[in-house]
């Protein structure tokens, strides 16, 4: 008989593969889409005295990414100017960041966020970790391709020159996007072996065998690892997250924690990140914007559901409390509704 865990795993698999990503996205393709009309309306909005931001927001947050690419193409054909450049001049602040993010393809957006996280002095490890830990094989392979196209260098090369030690090894292994895909066969022997190996390499021994942790957590499929982390609890007095906190520190600890949370429940991981970006004084807008833009066509509905379940109030409510103006309007459209 199937255990509850197997059923949940199967459901999460189906959520990730069998249904088109848009099924859980808050932004859908616009039905009566007309790229020429949208391009004309955006052109008029940009030329309006003081810029008609409302029209720009209304159009671009209510079109799918593919449709936005068509609008950009139509706009360039009309005006001989790039839509992104025109909007960069017309808008400012956080709203500009959201709108320019929406104009990029998902891989271009991730590639540019990764580049920004490693540019100049110091690395924004937080952004690097979030993107590298949460993207699928397919997404990572596409990011690698686009990154090289955009920056004439390999993503791996930039990660290597910007990070060090075991943290570098973990990031490089993940960035390759070579994790095993979820299969239909469940290998209980390997699940048990991996759970024991993770325990033997960490909590059980005096020092941590980090390469062993890295190889298991970056090579095995997501569904397999969900079962491994369950099984792990029968060997270790601590669960995987507690073990990580005991065994490693700094960026490596942060990366392993993010990775395990993504594997266990990705929508919940993003719900937590969104909550953290808005709690307390001041908003971490960079994180808020990146998640709202990058997940709007992937799993925003699941994220909203996890958010409400855990924090008692809706994501929509939190965004309303924490942001204002047309920036708020854009984020609320991407959120797709109140719960």
Swiss-Prot record:
The modification N6-acetyllysine is found at residues 49, 152, 227. Residues 2-24 are annotated as: S100A10-binding site. Disulfide bonds: none annotated. GO terms for cellular component: basement membrane; cytoplasm; endosome; extracellular region; nucleus; plasma membrane; vesicle membrane. There is a cross-link at residue 49 (Glycyl lysine isopeptide (Lys-Gly) (interchain with G-Cter in SUMO1)). Its main location: secreted. The modification N-acetylserine is found at residue 2. The modification Phosphoserine is found at residues 26, 184. Annexin repeats lie at residues 33-104, 105-176, 189-261, 265-336. Transmembrane segments: none annotated. One of its GO terms (molecular function) is phospholipase inhibitor activity. InterPro entries: Annexin, Annexin_repeat, Annexin_repeat_CS, Annexin_sf, ANX2. There is a cross-link at residue 49 (Glycyl lysine isopeptide (Lys-Gly) (interchain with G-Cter in SUMO2)). The keyword Acetylation applies. ISGylated. GO terms for biological process: positive regulation of receptor-mediated endocytosis involved in cholesterol transport. Keywords: Acetylation, Annexin, Basement membrane, Calcium, Calcium/phospholipid-binding, Extracellular matrix, Isopeptide bond, Phosphoprotein, Repeat, Secreted, Ubl conjugation. Heterotetramer containing 2 light chains of S100A10/p11 and 2 heavy chains of ANXA2/p36. Interacts with ATP1B1. Interacts with DYSF. Interacts with COCH. Interacts (via repeat Annexin 1) with PCSK9 (via the C-terminal domain); the interaction inhibits the degradation of LDLR. Interacts with CEACAM1 (via the cytoplasmic domain); this interaction is regulated by phosphorylation of CEACAM1. Interacts with APPL2 and APPL1; targets APPL2 to endosomes and acting in parallel to RAB5A. Interacts with S100A4. May interact with UBAP2. A pair of annexin repeats may form one binding site for calcium and phospholipid. Belongs to the annexin family. Calcium-regulated membrane-binding protein whose affinity for calcium is greatly enhanced by anionic phospholipids. It binds two calcium ions with high affinity. May be involved in heat-stress response. Inhibits PCSK9-enhanced LDLR degradation, probably reduces PCSK9 protein levels via a translational mechanism but also competes with LDLR for binding with PCSK9. Binds to endosomes damaged by phagocytosis of particulate wear debris and participates in endosomal membrane stabilization, thereby limiting NLRP3 inflammasome activation. It may cross-link plasma membrane phospholipids with actin and the cytoskeleton and be involved with exocytosis. This is Annexin A2. It comes from Cervus elaphus (Red deer). The gene is ANXA2.
């Amino acid at each position: 008989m199937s255990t509850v865990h197997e059923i949940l795993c199967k459901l999460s698999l189906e959520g990730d593969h069998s249904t088109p990503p848009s099924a859980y996205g808050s932004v859908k393709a616009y039905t009566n889409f007309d790229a020429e009309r949208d391009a004309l309306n955006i052109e008029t909005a940009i030329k309006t005295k003081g810029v008609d931001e409302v029209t720009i927001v209304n159009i671009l947050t209510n079109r799918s990414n593919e449709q936005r690419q068509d609008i950009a193409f139509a706009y360039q054909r009309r005006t001989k100017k790039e839509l992104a450049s025109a909007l960069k001049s017309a808008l400012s602040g956080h709203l500009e960041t959201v709108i320019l993010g929406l104009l990029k393809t998902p891989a271009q957006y991730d590639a540019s966020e990764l580049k920004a996280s490693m540019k100049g002095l110091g690395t924004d490890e937080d952004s690097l970790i979030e993107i590298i830990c949460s993207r699928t094989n397919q997404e990572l392979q596409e990011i690698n391709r686009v990154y090289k196209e955009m920056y004439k260098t390999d993503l791996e090369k930039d990660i290597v020159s910007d990070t060090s030690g075991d943290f570098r090894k973990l990031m490089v292994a993940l960035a390759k996007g070579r994790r095993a895909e979820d299969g239909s066969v469940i290998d209980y022997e390997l699940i048990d072996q991996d759970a024991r190996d993770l325990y033997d390499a960490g909590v059980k021994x005096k020092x941590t065998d980090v390469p062993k942790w890295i190889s298991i957590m970056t090579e095995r499929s997501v569904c397999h690892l969900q079962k491994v982390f369950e099984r792990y609890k029968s060997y270790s007095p601590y669960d995987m997250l507690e073990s990580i906190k005991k065994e490693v520190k700094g960026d490596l600890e942060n990366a392993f924690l993010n990775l395990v949370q993504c594997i266990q429940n990705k929508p919940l991981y993003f719900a937590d990140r969104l909550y953290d970006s808005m709690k307390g004084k001041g908003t971490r807008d960079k994180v808020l914007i990146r998640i709202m833009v990058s997940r709007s066509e992937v799993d925003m509905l699941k994220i909203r559901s996890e958010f409400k379940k855990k924090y008692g109030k809706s994501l929509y409510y939190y965004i309303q409390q924490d942001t204002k103006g047309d920036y708020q309007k854009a984020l609320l459209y991407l959120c797709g509704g109140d719960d």
